């Protein structure tokens, strides 16, 4: 099996690095430190121009849970239309109810819009906030999604391997199960061979120093964030995962 590697990024420098490392697909976000939010139209358009592999844009209007109200859904619909105008290949989304189930009415609205615009859909790790996956997996298939990104309902994919394997069996080729969260060169082959997932998802994150000299004590945001350290994908971390899979 030729395992796909999807790399999540939140800047264009990381896009170049992910491509250099051998990514098969890009999940384009803003604010990966918050779990990934919707990228700007300009970023989507530029990424679509640059990328030699499919680009899927995150549709998530805010950080926090995946319970979205009427205004949020309207915003998400506009963002899906922006994705089509920008030229990306797909969208990444998920909506839940307060009871911890998939919000099928909201998802039907969003997925219908995406399908109408010829955009493929990945249902993201919102599924990992549910108590069980069996019924939700069937619902996601019913919605016409292409794949599910999941850690197997665990804190990371390595700890979720048993559920991931069961999800692959239940899916039975009707939808791709993509393992994500904590995937790296050390555990990638074990996760893939144990679960038989066709795809792995990671950021390959690292940091680089700012090109600007630090000459101020002012902070642009949280004091926990160093404005002079830029988070970027490390191309070597991506290529090392590829090498581990083929070893």
Swiss-Prot record:
**Compartment annotation:** Cytoplasm
This protein's GO cellular component annotations are: cytoplasm
What InterPro entries has UniProt attached to this entry?
CutC-like, CutC-like_dom_sf
One Pfam entry for this protein is CutC
Entries under Gene3D superfamilies matching the protein: Copper homeostasis (CutC) domain
Instruction: Give the Polar residues compositional bias ranges.
Output: 205-222
Q: Which domain of life is it from?
A: Bacteria
Disordered: annotated span: 205-226
Cite the GO molecular-function annotations of the record. Answer: copper ion binding
Q: Which UniProt keywords apply?
A: Cytoplasm
Q: Which family would the database say this protein is a member of?
A: Belongs to the CutC family.
Q: Which PANTHER family match?
A: COPPER HOMEOSTASIS PROTEIN CUTC, COPPER HOMEOSTASIS PROTEIN CUTC HOMOLOG
Q: What is this protein called?
A: PF03932 family protein CutC
Organism (species): Vibrio atlanticus (strain LGP32) (Vibrio splendidus (strain Mel32))
